[in-house]
Amino acid sequence: MPHNTKSMDNTLNIKDNHVQIGGRKSKLAVVQSEIVKECIVEKFPELSCSVLALSTLGDKVQSKPLYSFGGKALWTKELEILLLEQVEEYPRLDLIVHSLKDIPTNLPEEFELGCILNREDARDALVMKSGSSYKSLADLPDGSLVGTSSVRRSSQLLKNHPKLRFDSVRGNLQTRLNKLDDENSPFECLLLASAGLIRIGLGDRITAHLDAPEMYYAVGQGALGIEIRKGDEKMLQLLKTIEDLPTTYCCLAERSLMRHLEGGCSVPIGVQSHYNESTNELSLKAIIVSPDGIHFVEDEYKGVVNNKDDADAIGIKVGDLLSAKGGREILNSINFERINLPPSSNTPTPQPITPITTNNS
C-alpha cells in the first residue's frame, strides 16, 4: 500500500470522473496496472478507472537480447503516443504504469514521472529448474548455463562466479519458466526480478534471493513508476496521494546516479539503497562491472534527505565517486556485440579498477 497517508480534497474536477490507465499487455504489467487502479479508487471512490493494455516493442521482439536495442524507451514509446492523443479506437491515456526500471531516466519533454509507488522486494531471484537439488549459484557445477537477458546480472555473475556460463532468455515470466523446466532445456537456472514473480503469484518458484555484494539490483527495480503528461496538475494532485516517499527518495537517488553516468537500462550498473525514516538518512551503494566481469568499481555514500532534490544530490555524489574510480571508462568501453560471448576457461580473477582519485567523504 502507498506510504503517503495524507488525505486530500477530492475535488479534482477530472473529466467524466474517469481515469484512463495504460500499461503493457503482459500478465505482470496488467497486474501492476490493477494495483495502481485499486490505489486510486481507494483514495477517490467517486472516480472510475479502466486499464488499456498494449504491446510495446519490447514485447513484440522476443528473438533479440535486450542490450541489442540500446535500452532506450524499449517499453514506453507506443504508450506515450496515447498520452498525447487518442489514436483510432484507442482512448487518450491519463497515465501509464511501468516497472520503474524500464522508464528512461531522461524522458521526452512532453512527459514526466508522476509518482513512484511502494517498492516490492527489489532483489534479484535465483530460480532453479523444477526438481533441481541445487540451492545456490555456488552449488552449480562449473560450466552450468544460467539464463538472463540482463547485462547487469550477467556481468556480476561473471565477476562472482566466473566458471558459470550464461545465455539470453526472453519472453514473459511464464514463458521463461517453461523454457527453464523443459526436459531438453540447457539452462540450470534463471535470474529474475523477485518483485515480478511475487506479484503474479509465483513467489514459490524463488530458490533464493540474491543480496549484495553477490548481486546488486537494477535502478528502480521492484518499484512502480507512473508516467504522465508534463504539467498535468490534476494527475499530479491525484498521484500525490498514492506515492511512497521512502521508495521515491531511494529510487530518485538511483535514477539520478544512472542519469549522471548516462547509462541506459541495459548497462551494468547495480545499486542498493535504504532510507531511514527515523534519521532521514539515505544510503546508496552502487557497482559498475564490465560485461566480462573482470573490471569493476564500487562505492557508497550516505546523507540526509528531506526532499526530492536531496535524493537527486545523493545519486550525483555516488556517480562522481564511481567516475573518479574509472566507472565512466567501463561504461564507455562496452561493446554490446561481445556481451553474450561465454567466458574463456582461463577467466582472470575480477579486479577493481585503480582509482584516479580517492574520495570517501
UniProtKB/Swiss-Prot annotation:
Pathway: Porphyrin-containing compound metabolism; protoporphyrin-IX biosynthesis; coproporphyrinogen-III from 5-aminolevulinate: step 2/4. It is an enzyme of class 2 (transferase). Transmembrane segments: none annotated. InterPro entries: HemC (IPR000860), Porphobilin_deaminase_cofac_BS (IPR022419), Porphobilin_deaminase_N (IPR022417), Porphobilinogen_deaminase_C (IPR022418), Porphobilinogen_deaminase_C_sf (IPR036803). One of its GO terms (cellular component) is cytoplasm. Residues 341-361 are annotated as: Disordered. Binds 1 dipyrromethane group covalently. Its cofactor is dipyrromethane. One of its GO terms (biological process) is protoporphyrinogen IX biosynthetic process. It comes from the Eukaryota. Its EC number is 2.5.1.61. One of its GO terms (molecular function) is hydroxymethylbilane synthase activity. It catalyses: 4 porphobilinogen + H2O = hydroxymethylbilane + 4 NH4(+). The porphobilinogen subunits are added to the dipyrromethan group. Belongs to the HMBS family. Tetrapolymerization of the monopyrrole PBG into the hydroxymethylbilane pre-uroporphyrinogen in several discrete steps. This is Porphobilinogen deaminase. It comes from Debaryomyces hansenii (strain ATCC 36239 / CBS 767 / BCRC 21394 / JCM 1990 / NBRC 0083 / IGC 2968) (Yeast).
